[in-house]
Amino acid sequence: MKKVSPSYLKHQFLIAMPHMHDENFAQTLTYVVEHNANGAMGLVINRPQSLTLADVLEQLRPELPAPKRCQEIAIHSGGPVQTDRGFVLHPSGQTFQATVNLPGGISLSTSQDVLFSIADGYGPDQNVITLGYAGWDAGQLDAEMADNAWLTCSFDPAILFDVDSEQRLDAAARRLGINLNLISTQAGHA
């Protein structure tokens, strides 16, 4: 009998299906940072909060005023897990105290120095900053996929870095040739 290796979704986008009722994930686009036999981790990339980088810097280094440009850099709600922890997706090249290189020429940094670098004008110009992440236990994301909770879309750095946050979900769906407004809110199997 032929052994089939599991199909993992690392470095792909997850598009929440219209029937997704979990408010943490309804109408979201999630970048899958890791997916293996032990579970999965992703970052929701289309939910900007009312917080900006200026607000975060006020907490991290209150002795220094945040540069004006930091008021324009959105902080996204990356998911419901560890919502006080920051994650920054950015193109590979620069490394910080805690940087992991991911496929496709992007990196994930989790140390404060990446935020200071962005604020001070010498960090990665292209970035998505989130607080929190989405986490799935072993087999949980696989089960949600089998239940038609998500569509997958191949990663496109333009969607991550060049498309406005609020347009990313539709941009990923268009990449698949889909209009999410035309998909039924009822799920099923044929």
UniProtKB/Swiss-Prot annotation:
InterPro entries: AlgH-like. It comes from the Bacteria. GO terms for cellular component: cytosol. It holds the Pfam family DUF179. Coiled coil: none annotated. PANTHER family: UNCHARACTERIZED PROTEIN YQGE, UPF0301 PROTEIN YQGE. Belongs to the UPF0301 (AlgH) family. NCBIfam families: PRK00228.1-1. This is UPF0301 protein PSPPH_0476. It comes from Pseudomonas savastanoi pv. phaseolicola (strain 1448A / Race 6).
